[in-house]
């Protein structure tokens, strides 16, 4: 078996390299020549204004809105009561805007949505991240369970009250159809209007896609981190949403029970992998940018992530090809001077220094391997290669603005060799070649059919590769959770 596996490697390693060479291109990064960005999306403006605590985000290459709020020139987050008339139930069961999508006027919703977008996002704004955070219900009937059962029950009552003569089977069938059709219309038309009004912004819904790999509490010893097969199937059915989105926004918030564990890495790894899978299938011409919501602290606490979990979250996301991390938090991050100082301590400690490390390494790899025309992604997603600057490099404070890494000539060559061993280039739109050194005029004009051809080939080869590994060497197809610094 060992000899057979070695023989397969001789075939598969060049194949892996070829697969990456025909991947659909990525969109260029939101900041030129900065392939991986870290954004701050916590409302911490009070720390500076009321408590005179400067979080010094810019110093560590962490990008924020000018006022450190959640609705600015860099990133906008629309919550349920801030965009149109989103129908939902409060936690105590009170309906708002009809409660369910089929009980709310879509035209009325869109009219208010247009006003809300115009008021929040200036017409001259050319780019930026815009996240719609609608979490109360899911557009797929079967995903409304637990606290979301109220949407199914209310939909059944809504249909039954209008048609008391119908059988229960017909009521169930029609209620599901009405809910799913109305939910889809709400989300799809909202995105369509948003893109019509602000076409250059990166629009998407928060937690789409989800992986539903939350069973680490139930079976911690046997936890794999993989998305359940039926949830992957459900995600595939949302093609209407993916093809309309211009970015994907999933999340990797870590529960404290996962602290510094292999399960934390498994949890993050497969959530990011699923988002990257959806990003590739969403469009014909390019892969959607994926931004990962994370937190600087463990859930429901102000305990900073450990160094290991910074690697598990920020490091893993960068290595798998995400466009960036969004560090999210609520008003509890700035409700007192003590809390602000805790946030500042985290940023000026391991979080900030690791943020500089990863963003610098991603930039260095893009420059060295991809001619600044692509981002570095792992040759194989299951490897343990990370975008880290060498320990021998030094951080210097440049122009009183931010830290930058300075690498010695000897370390530079060794680092480039190490990056070539673990990473390949994922070229930006209109660029191709092993080092993204060639530009295609056809792709620039948007006329070429090459991306679709490449997509079909890459999907076929990826499926073939996965099947070979699964059938021939299943025990070896495990994520290597050792770390490389």
Across the structure, where does each feature detected by a protein language model lie?
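Substrate-binding cleft of secreted/luminal carbohydrate-active enzymes
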Residues: 28-51, 66-67, 73, 78-81, ...
């Amino acid at each position: 078996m060992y000899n057979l596996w070695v023989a397969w490697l001789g075939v598969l390693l060049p194949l892996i390299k070829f697969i990456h060479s025909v991947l659909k291109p990525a969109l260029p990064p939101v900041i030129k020549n900065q392939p991986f960005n870290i954004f701050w999306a916590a409302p911490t403006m009070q720390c500076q204004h009321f408590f005179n605590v400067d979080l010094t985000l810019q110093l560590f290459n962490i990008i924020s809105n000018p006022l450190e709020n959640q609705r600015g020139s860099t990133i906008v987050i629309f919550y349920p009561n801030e965009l149109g008339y989103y129908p939902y139930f409060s936690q105590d069961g009170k309906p708002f805007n009809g409660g369910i999508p089929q009980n709310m006027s879509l035209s009325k919703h869109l009219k208010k949505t247009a006003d809300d977008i115009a008021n929040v996002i200036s017409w001259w704004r050319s780019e930026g991240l815009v996240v719609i955070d609608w979490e109360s219900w899911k557009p797929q009937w079967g995903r409304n369970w637990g606290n979301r059962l109220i949407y199914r029950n209310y939909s059944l009552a809504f249909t039954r009250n209008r048609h008391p003569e119908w059988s229960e089977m017909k009521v169930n069938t029609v209620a599901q159809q009405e809910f799913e059709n109305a939910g889809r219309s709400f989300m799809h038309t909202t995105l369509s209007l948003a893109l019509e009004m602000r076409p250059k912004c990166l629009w998407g819904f928060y937690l789409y896609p989800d992986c539903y790999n939350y069973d680490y509490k139930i079976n911690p010893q046997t936890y794999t981190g993989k998305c359940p097969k039926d949830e992957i199937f459900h995600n595939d059915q949302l093609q209407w949403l993916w093809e309309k989105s211009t970015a994907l926004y999933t999340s990797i918030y870590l529960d404290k029970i996962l602290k510094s564990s292999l399960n934390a890495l498994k949890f993050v790894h497969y959530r990011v992998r699923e988002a990257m899978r959806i990003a590739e299938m969403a469009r014909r011409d390019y892969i959607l940018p994926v931004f990962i919501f994370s937190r600087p602290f463990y859930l429901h606490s102000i305990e900073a992530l450990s160094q290991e979990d910074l690697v598990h979250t920020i490091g893993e996301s960068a290595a798998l090809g995400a466009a960036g991390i969004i560090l999210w938090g609520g008003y509890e991050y700035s409700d007192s001077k003590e809390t602000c100082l805790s946030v500042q301590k985290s940023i000026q400690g391991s979080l900030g220094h690791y943020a500089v490390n990863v963003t610098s390494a991603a930039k260095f790899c893009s420059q060295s391997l991809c001619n600044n025309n692509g981002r570095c992604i792992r040759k194989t997603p299951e490897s343990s290669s990370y975008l880290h600057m060498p320990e021998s490099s030094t951080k210097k404070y440049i122009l009183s603005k931010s830290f930058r890494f300075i690498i010695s000539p000897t370390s530079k060559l060794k680092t480039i060799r190490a990056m070539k061993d673990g990473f390949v280039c994922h070229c930006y739109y209109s660029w191709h070649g092993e080092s993204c050194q060639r530009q295609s005029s056809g792709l620039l004009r948007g006329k070429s059919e090459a991306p679709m051809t490449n997509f079909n080939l890459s999907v076929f080869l990826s499926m073939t590769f996965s099947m070979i590994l699964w059938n021939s060497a299943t025990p070896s197809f495990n994520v290597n959770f050792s770390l490389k610094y």
